[in-house]
Amino acid sequence: MSNVTFKNDPVTLLGAEKKVGDSAPDFTVLANDLSKKHLSDYKGKVKVISVVPSIDTGVCSEQTRRFNQEATNLENVQILTISMDLPFAQKRWCAANGIDRVDTLSDHREADFGQKYGVIIEELRLLSRAVFVVDENDKITYVEYLSEVSNHPDYEAVLSHLNK
């Protein structure tokens, strides 16, 4: 990803940028109960990986709520929201917002996901907003790195891709 900004200030992304056709690297993150979760735990399903800087901000909150709403119409699709938030904060936020169709996962401990998918904002140690779709065979079929972290992803493009 070349030029990325956060509130119009340039930032540096660390890690390996992913492209359509790449194998999706397995990663280790934490679930809300502090158990380890891996991409491989979702084998056999299409995965939408919705990456947000912090679940407690406006755009991130709207993004997660939107994907939770859309999940009711998606067969054999698992939506994962990954951020650097602590699992406790994610659990509290999900309960307060009625989020029950999205798995919220934390990359705060090792930044393993962020490094492998090229979304760590070096200056902030947050994840840059992005969306990845990974098929049943763990191939990346859709990628959107947002050039301005505070913008919304293209929800319609993601949904159109899933409904092909």
Swiss-Prot record:
<keyword id="KW-0049">Antioxidant</keyword>
<feature type="active site" description="Cysteine sulfenic acid (-SOH) intermediate">
    <location>
        <position position="60"/>
    </location>
</feature>
<keyword id="KW-0560">Oxidoreductase</keyword>
<comment type="function">
    <text>Thiol-specific peroxidase that catalyzes the reduction of hydrogen peroxide and organic hydroperoxides to water and alcohols, respectively. Plays a role in cell protection against oxidative stress by detoxifying peroxides.</text>
</comment>
<feature type="domain" description="Thioredoxin">
    <location>
        <begin position="18"/>
        <end position="164"/>
    </location>
</feature>
<dbReference type="GO" id="GO:0008379">
    <property type="term" value="F:thioredoxin peroxidase activity"/>
</dbReference>
<comment type="similarity">
    <text>Belongs to the peroxiredoxin family. Tpx subfamily.</text>
</comment>
<dbReference type="InterPro" id="IPR036249">
    <property type="entry name" value="Thioredoxin-like_sf"/>
</dbReference>
<keyword id="KW-0676">Redox-active center</keyword>
<dbReference type="InterPro" id="IPR013766">
    <property type="entry name" value="Thioredoxin_domain"/>
</dbReference>
<dbReference type="InterPro" id="IPR018219">
    <property type="entry name" value="Tpx_CS"/>
</dbReference>
<dbReference type="InterPro" id="IPR013740">
    <property type="entry name" value="Redoxin"/>
</dbReference>
<comment type="subunit">
    <text>Homodimer.</text>
</comment>
<protein>
    <recommendedName>
        <fullName>Thiol peroxidase</fullName>
        <ecNumber>1.11.1.24</ecNumber>
    </recommendedName>
</protein>
<dbReference type="InterPro" id="IPR002065">
    <property type="entry name" value="TPX"/>
</dbReference>
<dbReference type="InterPro" id="IPR050455">
    <property type="entry name" value="Tpx_Peroxidase_subfamily"/>
</dbReference>
<dbReference type="Pfam" id="PF08534">
    <property type="entry name" value="Redoxin"/>
</dbReference>
<feature type="disulfide bond" description="Redox-active">
    <location>
        <begin position="60"/>
        <end position="94"/>
    </location>
</feature>
<keyword id="KW-1015">Disulfide bond</keyword>
<keyword id="KW-0575">Peroxidase</keyword>
